[in-house]
Amino acid sequence: MQILNGEKITLGTCYYPEHWDEALWREDLSRMLACGIEVIRIAEFAWNKIEPAEGVYNYDFFDRFLDVAEEAGMKVIMGTPTATPPAWLTEKYPECLNAGIDGTLYRHGLRRHYNYNSPVYRKLCGNIVEHMAGHYGGRSCVIGWQIDNELNCEANEFYSESDTAAFRGYLQKKYGSLEKLNEAWGAVFWNQTYTDWKEVYVPRPTVSGGVNPHQTLDYLRFISESTNEFARMQADIIRKYIKEGDFITTNGLFGHVDYQKMAGESIDFITYDSYPNFAYDLNNYSDKDEMKDRKWSRNLTETRAVSRIFGIMEQQSGAGGWNSRMMQPTPRRGQMTLWTMQSIAHGADFVSYFRWRTCTFGTEIYWHGILDYSGRDNRRLAEVGDIYKKVTALREIAGGEYEAAVGVIKDYDNIFDAEYDKWHE
């Protein structure tokens, strides 16, 4: 299937109507359309706006916004809000929380603090997705759905009690007996033999910090499977309600996920979150001679390997940083154009800039969008308009598929194993 529009390359942006006064909505959409932005992604962090209390659903807020979007002629990608469970949920059901390897729960206050394997959380996620898809799936302006947001970003290891229980079930299904598990894990070494399934856990703190490497590999396979099951659960629900031609995607790429499996079972195509100036992150060492932001071609190549047609859900448009640190500088003049064309050259049919307005509050207060805090026109907005003119001239390549001259085999088992079985950085 084509992404969004098989006749041309499409530009978009990420918009958060819940962050802004409703009086700005029409103005914002009008300004977007004027510079060539035709699609917005919304709602991926807005669980409370739809379900302010358990089982209590209120559609008024996004009904009003979608009315404005339809009136303006703006197309919309709806995000399922499961990346940020509300406070009422985690307070009532702490078993939904993820934990560190020492068992300490990750509490409410940031995002991605849940685990995939809590039966309660899966049920509550299924409920919110069912209600959202059932209510908004038929809207004419809604053209697609994003599952969750950045699955396995921030946290890609899970150590809650729910994960231990699910890990045991995963191993029982895989091996069938403790005898076969012990053999596969070489458990006779250092007297690690298991005699009861209740003795088997996800990795836990040890004297030296190391864990049985065979156990660890199975554990990372289990995380990948758990992530895919979570995505598949949401996709199966959404497909019951979407219109013909609407799509389901999610945004990546992050660790401990077999994206090829996800593309085959859950989503229509993958989208990538592209922040090339992470190459200049002062928190991470990088060699002075490396390719910096130009090495992003490798990431785009991996994205294309997941689905031959793909999109960019978040393309860097400003400086990036949380309230606790700055991670990437503002794009120089022309860099947004360079990165957009780089993505399109690799096969992207859709490029969406993060975000429209820079937020004036919250953890991402320093994560700049197209517009700065003032909301006034600036050079980045003008550059988006220039990009639109360029991509309009490239309309004949929309839907085209990239032909690679060289292929690289990627094996998830080897990647997972190499995280722990390594001798140098």
PLM segments and residue spans:
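An acidic-aromatic substrate-binding cleft motif
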Residues: 1-24, 29-38, 285
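Short, acidic/polar
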Residues: 19-34, 125-131, 252-263, 332-341
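Conserved, mostly hydrophobic/aromatic
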Residues: 13, 32, 40, 69, ...
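Short, well-ordered coil/turn segments that N-cap beta-strands
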Residues: 7-11, 36-38, 70-76, 138-143, ...
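The substrate-binding groove and active-site-proximal loops of carbohydrate-active enzymes
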Residues: 10-22, 43-62, 107-126, 151-156, ...
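Carbohydrate-binding surfaces of carbohydrate-active enzymes
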Residues: 200, 204, 232, 244, ...
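Aromatic-lined substrate-binding rim segments of carbohydrate-active enzymes
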Residues: 26-106, 130-133, 234-242
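Polysaccharide-binding and catalytic clefts of secreted carbohydrate-active enzymes
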Residues: 102-269, 273-293, 298
